[in-house]
């Protein structure tokens, strides 16, 4: 049992779970826009997500991150190194537009952690805009990036899916902001710090209503996607309702984070069963 728990803990801390959640959102994009699933894109994004999030998590320990003796951190380093090799190899199979857009998104990830001016502040320190930049990058990675490999794109519907994804990610991120209240410096001025937990939850509920409203605009009109989006909005609302500052260890990092996986499974089930 201890071994299973150790593997599960590594699965969470190494960003593997998060990477599968990101892939779920990409597959949802393909399904929503009736595009063929590109497994090379999924492979690239999976490896890039593991590397990026492990870098973000442990960047505060730089340069000591590369010389740590902690076994669990070393395992994460090895995983990131292997993913890095896979990512470099896979880049050679992408087209120029996809590579260019990938570097554009990588730039945001880089300045999220690395200071970009003399004040030694990075995007992570600008908390009033941080959550929106995170949502922009997530929405771009899971909507625009997969479409760069296609020649025929419905730009209106793609933009609506991007907008819906952006709204969803902001709401989806707020439980993590609430969880981190006891760790974040008051100077960060996160949404829960500025408006309180109750008001933060109200903001999330409003965003989820907007998320559902956008569903009715996206074409073609599909009962499967509407039901799926309604149910996932309800599930996310329930998770937000249950979110509190002092929560169980894996509530946010596993259960809340798993919402995109549930969303994908729900979508596949509804597509296969709805006439």
Residue spans of the language-model regions?
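Interhelical loop and helix-boundary elements at the membrane-water interface
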Residues: 2-18, 61-79, 114-136, 190, ...
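Hydrophobic alpha-helical transmembrane segments of membrane proteins
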Residues: 10-17, 24-26, 30, 43, ...
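Helix-coil boundary and interhelical linker segments in multi-pass alpha-helical membrane proteins
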Residues: 24-44, 88-100, 140-163, 214-225, ...
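Transmembrane alpha-helical segments that form the membrane-embedded catalytic/substrate-channel core
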Residues: 47-59, 106-118, 140, 165-181, ...
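Solvent-exposed interhelical
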Residues: 49-81, 170-208
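Intramembrane alpha-helical segments
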Residues: 73-149, 238-239
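Glycine/small-residue-rich hydrophobic helix-like segments
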Residues: 190-239
């Amino acid at each position: 049992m201890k071994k299973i728990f150790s593997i599960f803990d590594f699965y969470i801390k190494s960003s593997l779970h998060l990477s599968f959640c990101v892939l779920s959102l990409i597959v949802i994009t393909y399904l929503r826009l009736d595009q063929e699933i590109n497994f090379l894109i999924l492979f690239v994004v999976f490896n890039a997500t593991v590397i990026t999030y492990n870098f973000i998590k442990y960047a505060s320990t730089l340069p000591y991150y590369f010389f740590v003796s902690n076994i669990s951190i070393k395992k994460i380093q090895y995983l990131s190194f292997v993913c890095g090799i896979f990512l470099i190899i896979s880049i050679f199979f992408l087209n120029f537009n996809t590579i260019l857009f990938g570097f554009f998104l990588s730039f945001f990830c880089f300045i999220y952690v690395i200071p970009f001016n003399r004040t030694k502040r990075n995007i992570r320190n600008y908390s009033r805009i941080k959550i929106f930049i995170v949502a922009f990058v997530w929405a771009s990675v899971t909507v625009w990036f997969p479409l760069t490999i296609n020649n025929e794109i419905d730009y209106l519907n793609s933009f609506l899916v991007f907008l819906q994804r952006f709204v969803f990610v902001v709401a989806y991120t707020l439980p993590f902001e609430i969880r981190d209240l006891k760790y974040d410096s008051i100077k960060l001025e996160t949404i829960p710090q500025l408006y309180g937990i109750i008001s933060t939850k109200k903001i999330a509920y409003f965003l989820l209503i907007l998320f559902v409203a956008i569903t009715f605009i996206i074409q073609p009109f599909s009962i499967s996607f509407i039901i799926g989006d309604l149910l996932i909005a309800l599930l996310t609302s329930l998770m937000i309702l249950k979110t509190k500052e002092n929560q169980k260890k894996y509530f946010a990092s596993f259960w809340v984070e798993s919402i995109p996986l549930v969303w994908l499974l729900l979508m596949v089930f509804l597509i296969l069963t709805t006439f």
